[in-house]
A protein has these predicted regions:
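Divalent-cation
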Residues: 1-169
Length: 169
């Protein structure tokens, strides 16, 4: 995931990826095209390739799968946002205001990678901070071990084992 975000950032390919958490996103998924594919850099980069049918709109990720692409999101009503933030950023913030989803945005104009969570935007994420944020976000203490263990291939088995055992190895 992080590799594909960095590749798109470097090439200035805009992207919006929404990670479903506890709040279901069925209505949003229904607005797009069903994909149901395993997360991979080539798939993500192909979806967001400019001038292709799926590149507009958001990709929705559930667990370790891309469930839909070209999904329509409601924009935030926050009029205090900087004018330099476009529709992609406003949509990313909007979905996180009404759900517990987390959105990752790659700016088409600047290549800047940002994250929206709880209606707030964090900009200028580099590879290290993106890895840390995604790992922390998807390995919280209050989720059952079965959910965590399904993340091992996405974030690394060692990180999942440490979180489950509660100690550092």
């Amino acid at each position: 995931m992080v590799r594909s975000l960095n590749n798109m950032s470097r090439k200035r390919i805009g992207a919006l990826i929404v990670f479903e958490r506890r709040t279901g996103l069925a209505d949003v998924i229904d607005s797009g095209t069903v994909i149901d594919g395993e997360i991979s850099a080539p798939l993500i980069e192909n979806i967001f390739e400019p001038n292709t049918p799926l590149h507009d709109g958001a990709v929705i990720v559930r667990g370790e799968r891309i469930v839909a692409a070209a999904c329509i999101l409601q924009l935030t009503d926050d009029h205090s946002l900087s004018r330099e933030l476009g529709t992609r950023h406003r949509a990313a913030i909007g979905i996180t205001e009404s759900t517990d989803a987390v959105s990752i945005i790659v700016s088409e104009e600047t290549g800047i990678i940002s994250m929206a969570r709880d209606g707030k935007l964090t900009r200028y994420l580099d590879t290290k901070s993106l890895n840390i944020l995604l790992t922390e976000l998807f390995m919280p203490d209050d989720l059952p071990p079965a959910w965590l263990s399904s993340r091992s291939s996405l974030f690394g088995a060692r990180a999942v084992k440490q979180k489950e055992d509660g100690d550092e190895e």
